[in-house]
Amino acid sequence: MAEQTEHSINGGGLKFDYFSPNENHRFNVFASAQHINRDSYYGPGDRDPLDAYGNTTDLNWMAGSQYVYSFGKCIFMPSDLTAGIEFNQDKLEDNMWGYNRTVDQKVNIGSAFLQNEWKNDHWGFLIGGRLDKHNLIDHVIFSPRANLRYNPTENINLRLSY
């Protein structure tokens, strides 16, 4: 029995960052992509050797944007409000011709998130949430987030997260 795979992987990304002169506003836009092509041969076992050849292609790309506003003081201490959106798509095609098997799958995930993090040298408190819509799931998924941080000294960080 013999096995062999040959891969061709290409990818890249771009990012743009903007910082306001007073650094209270930060904005970024990003995009990346990766393409994979794989030719494979997974030994025949008890089948015809020509049945064991296959090919896989996968194209994945994502794009998004994020905005951060830094408050000098929001309610009880300085904080950063972060909001953003993302979109991710994965297109997979996997063929094993001799086994009469093909996987043709396209996954789209759109996301939006919002969080606020209050912080100073000793304390940090973060609360936020994320909404994800996956094309293979009927409903929107909400993921809450909360974090409490205490730094009694410069070298000790205690965290409680949800």
Task: Describe each model-derived feature in a short phrase.
Residues 1-162:
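Outer-membrane beta-barrel proteins, especially TonB-dependent receptors
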